[in-house]
Amino acid sequence: MYLFESLNQLIQTYLPEDQIKRLRQAYLVARDAHEGQTRSSGEPYITHPVAVACILAEMKLDYETLMAALLHDVIEDTPATYQDMEQLFGKSVAELVEGVSKLDKLKFRDKKEAQAENFRKMIMAMVQDIRVILIKLADRTHNMRTLGSLRPDKRRRIARETLEIYSPLAHRLGIHHIKTELEELGFEALYPNRYRVIKEVVKAARGNRKEMIQKILSEIEGRLQEAGIPCRVSGREKHLYSIYCKMVLKEQRFHSIMDIYAFRVIVNDSDTCYRVLGQMHSLYKPRPGRVKDYIAIPKANGYQSLHTSMIGPHGVPVEVQIRTEDMDQMAEMGVAAHWAYKEHGETSTTAQIRAQRWMQSLLELQQSAGSSFEFIESVKSDLFPDEIYVFTPEGRIVELPAGATPVDFAYAVHTDIGHACVGARVDRQPYPLSQPLTSGQTVEIITAPGARPNAAWLNFVVSSKARAKIRQLLKNLKRDDSVSLGRRLLNHALGGSRKLNEIPQENIQRELDRMKLATLDDLLAEIGLGNAMSVVVAKNLQHGDASIPPATQSHGHLPIKGADGVLITFAKCCRPIPGDPIIAHVSPGKGLVIHHESCRNIRGYQKEPEKFMAVEWDKETAQEFITEIKVEMFNHQGALANLTAAINTTTSNIQSLNTEEKDGRVYSAFIRLTARDRVHLANIMRKIRVMPDVIKVTRNRN
């Protein structure tokens, strides 16, 4: 029982004796079930479930969750069954144990498919009982703490998965301390050198800032004491992964991040929060537009606080978060606070209500998604959103991810409104459907009977619900709709000089024979469903009179599906490669010009969908494509030679290389090179990223 002691010390502080007794029983069952099993480190396996239970006990979670944590690997790794668990510990604990089990017994074509399907199962198990994910997050936290005994490649894979899925999931559920620990451990495992460098410079910077921190802390405490406001004031340290992300994603310099002095003020009630805000603004000058009220409008994960940014002593930036004790606990524990042990029942917390709402949307996604991959991508985009808050004409607040458009808003209000949307008014003014919204706007959707979604909407909507619902409807297009759409596309591709009814019947029959189709309607349906390209069919029907010159390729697979006999040009502005989302337009003399969907030169193409067409890469193409990357490096002797040598090892050829000095120590290299597809390019960039002199690698396109 000595291994149980660490857990026992934690639960003695808040659980009654009868529940502690049941936990001891669960420990003994788990210990006996895992008898003889060891972890990669050589320790007895039972140390892992005990550690997971301890993480949850530190959050003061209920005894059923702790019992399930102790037993969470029993069904998967031992002969014990669900029925055994139910008989010994009741249905609730048995369901939790079964929900947490990894369920990897099914056979999949590859590891990626298995991972995507397991993720799908995990999310669905979480929807049934959110305690499943609390146990899973604690399980992942302990696994991250003990990564050292694994192979380096396995460490990196687990760390990347943690940063992409588990840490954002903890954030989405408001469990801040778990999210932070997962980020720090994942960062250290994935980028050990960067972690070490940032840790050292942060340590040095914090030492230099002590005097200023103490001065600001004293001034804040003094002002609030004068105002008779009881409070607790503390400095707020920035975490290493947060600093790294700001340096990489926002291209901020280290010192500009560390020069911000951050503090937290904890008070007794929400009214006092606003009094403290007034005192802060009389002490230091507030920065316009930098006050955020998350008390009146909480974040999606239930987080509540007042944020203000001010100019402090000697002009230094000062950020202050103001919240109550309850809000502080919610900020740290999120939905986990709902299952913290309480002697008396309580109503659901804000975080719990919001989490349930989010999980309901996951159920809808599960029903709409065509595959595990589509589902995992939709959920990942929904895990870590920057939110905006807009209003319906009736004044209801609607929460949307940053970058959301009126179409996202329409689907957030109701699926039927999204499907029937034909226009929008924002703040009573006409507003483009593709233009992003900003917080505080009032949005009104204009609908029309019989209207339906435009496939081009998928190019600008950002919410997972909108994407899933649009895809679902487009997949279910009836044959008549496909024929009608195909007719319009083909007539447009034929140009103004000829229409379909002017094409000789023998030409149509020859094209039907070529495509092995029976009727003209079959051909039009294929075009409408995107299985055949209207410009290619138009060219064949006109005997080469179309504006697309014939292809010069005489052998091998064409890179674009269905473009046989057509000249293809890849736009040099964005240099798309297989795997990129692409769109095409016809250009006289250049044939079919392929652009990346986000290319600036075709921005706004959604307004003229008739001029553009959706195209797909041919999976069997063996062609190499030219793309461009940007590498930021320290200006050390031999760095450039090492860079080119690293690229040569990836079977890529360098077409051109230009450098540009940023400052005395850092320069940027712009490299045009060959890549077979996005996977090949990712391998090249990964090879470069681990070089000691490299700061940052990005793909360079307009």
From Swiss-Prot:
One of its GO terms (cellular component) is cytosol. Gene3D superfamilies: 3.10.20.30, 3.30.70.260, Beta Polymerase, domain 2 (3.30.460.10), Hypothetical protein af1432 (1.10.3210.10). SMART domains: HDc, RelA_SpoT. Its EC number is 2.7.6.5, 3.1.7.2. Changing residue 294 to I: Synthesizes (p)ppGpp, complements a relA/spoT double disruption. Disruption phenotype: In the presence of wild-type relA, spoT cannot be deleted because ppGpp accumulation is toxic. In the double relA/spoT deletion (a ppGpp0 mutant) there is a very large increase in biofilm formation (in a csrA-disrupted background). The ppGpp0 mutant makes decreased levels of CsrA and its inhibitory small RNAs (sRNA) CsrB and CsrC. The double relA/spoT deletion obviates persister cell formation in a hipA7 mutant. Keywords: Cytoplasm, Hydrolase, Kinase, Manganese, Transferase. It holds the Pfam family TGS. InterPro entries: ACT-like_dom_sf, ACT_dom, Beta-grasp_dom_sf, HD/PDEase_dom, HD_domain, NT_sf, RelA/Spo_fam, RelA/SpoT_AH_RIS. It is found in: Cytoplasm. GO terms for molecular function: GTP diphosphokinase activity; guanosine-3',5'-bis(diphosphate) 3'-diphosphatase activity; kinase activity. One of its GO terms (biological process) is guanosine tetraphosphate metabolic process. Belongs to the RelA/SpoT family. In eubacteria ppGpp (guanosine 3'-diphosphate 5'-diphosphate) is a mediator of the stringent response which coordinates a variety of cellular activities in response to changes in nutritional abundance. This enzyme catalyzes both the synthesis and degradation of ppGpp. The second messengers ppGpp and c-di-GMP together control biofilm formation in response to translational stress; ppGpp represses biofilm formation while c-di-GMP induces it. ppGpp activates transcription of CsrA-antagonistic small RNAs CsrB and CsrC, which down-regulate CsrA's action on translation during the stringent response. Interacts with ObgE/CgtA (AC P42641); this association is not required for pre-50S ribosome binding. Under both amino acid and carbon starvation conditions about half of the protein dissociates from the ribosome. This is Bifunctional (p)ppGpp synthase/hydrolase SpoT. The lineage of its organism: Bacteria, Pseudomonadati, Pseudomonadota, Gammaproteobacteria, Enterobacterales. The gene is spoT.
